[in-house]
């Protein structure tokens, strides 16, 4: 479909095939949406397919485009596809149950459809109107239709971007823990970073740190926000998050998603703060908690990882932890904590060998 002959053939097939074959063709197109959307011919066919698809398939296409709106908004063809979907009556009907939201979106539709380069002043006024009510802003960005609109509005002007940023910051937790809202937050960060405004970039990263504990309670999008932030390997960001989770590392280590966050933090060599804070918790915790940690499916991995990192980077931490674990080794033998016992026993033997070696010298 991306080649001229393939494009002509696809156009003919859509014009003459029966309902069953059209549906099959729509399904094939759906599976290759991202590839087709980046090609001139493919994008034309894609728009035609979405237009003729039944309501069930239109809904599937709308879902897929909303999920990938961020990557689509990175190029002109993708933006034209988003605009095409926004202009469909089917898409407009998805918000008709909320009159206030529906009317506001109709105003955005009007501005966005006037020309390829929408009237920035009108967009700014509409975005400001949206911000008068934080609940309305939140409802707007978490709908598929609203999310698509924001994706193609972001980056058109600094004034409009500042308004959207204010909305994201005001409802930060709600936005970042929502599937579509999360994507708006990521796009907002990238728009300001691309413009060279690193202050905004740092503000968002600081907000992630401030709300770190709350975000850990959301194993889906909250966890995804963490992974994105930590994978930036930004020293201040890692430190913000580490401090935001202070006194909760052991608690998180018992949870599947929580242990993943702790592991990512202590693995991020750009900052030693997470390692120090985890050590403080382990040193302070009682023996029962330490045994539970060593014998827990997720906690065991954190303790093992911590021992390895402490030995490599903080030998004093490693020594303190070995001293704390030594009296507990018998209760760990024959359990999931056997690997911890093996590490301590190996270290003990190494120390003995060193002492003997020094004595012989």
Curated annotation (Swiss-Prot):
<dbReference type="GO" id="GO:0005737">
    <property type="term" value="C:cytoplasm"/>
</dbReference>
<dbReference type="InterPro" id="IPR016024">
    <property type="entry name" value="ARM-type_fold"/>
</dbReference>
<keyword id="KW-0694">RNA-binding</keyword>
<feature type="repeat" description="Pumilio 7">
    <location>
        <begin position="244"/>
        <end position="284"/>
    </location>
</feature>
<dbReference type="GO" id="GO:0006417">
    <property type="term" value="P:regulation of translation"/>
</dbReference>
<keyword id="KW-0677">Repeat</keyword>
<comment type="function">
    <text>Sequence-specific RNA-binding protein that regulates translation and mRNA stability by binding the 3'-UTR of target mRNAs.</text>
</comment>
<dbReference type="InterPro" id="IPR001313">
    <property type="entry name" value="Pumilio_RNA-bd_rpt"/>
</dbReference>
<feature type="repeat" description="Pumilio 8">
    <location>
        <begin position="285"/>
        <end position="319"/>
    </location>
</feature>
<feature type="repeat" description="Pumilio 4">
    <location>
        <begin position="132"/>
        <end position="167"/>
    </location>
</feature>
<feature type="domain" description="PUM-HD">
    <location>
        <begin position="5"/>
        <end position="348"/>
    </location>
</feature>
<feature type="repeat" description="Pumilio 3; degenerate">
    <location>
        <begin position="104"/>
        <end position="131"/>
    </location>
</feature>
<feature type="repeat" description="Pumilio 5; degenerate">
    <location>
        <begin position="168"/>
        <end position="205"/>
    </location>
</feature>
<feature type="repeat" description="Pumilio 2">
    <location>
        <begin position="64"/>
        <end position="103"/>
    </location>
</feature>
<dbReference type="InterPro" id="IPR033133">
    <property type="entry name" value="PUM-HD"/>
</dbReference>
<feature type="repeat" description="Pumilio 6; degenerate">
    <location>
        <begin position="206"/>
        <end position="243"/>
    </location>
</feature>
<protein>
    <recommendedName>
        <fullName>Putative pumilio homolog 22</fullName>
    </recommendedName>
</protein>
<dbReference type="InterPro" id="IPR011989">
    <property type="entry name" value="ARM-like"/>
</dbReference>
<feature type="repeat" description="Pumilio 1">
    <location>
        <begin position="27"/>
        <end position="63"/>
    </location>
</feature>
<keyword id="KW-0810">Translation regulation</keyword>
<dbReference type="GO" id="GO:0003723">
    <property type="term" value="F:RNA binding"/>
</dbReference>
<keyword id="KW-0963">Cytoplasm</keyword>
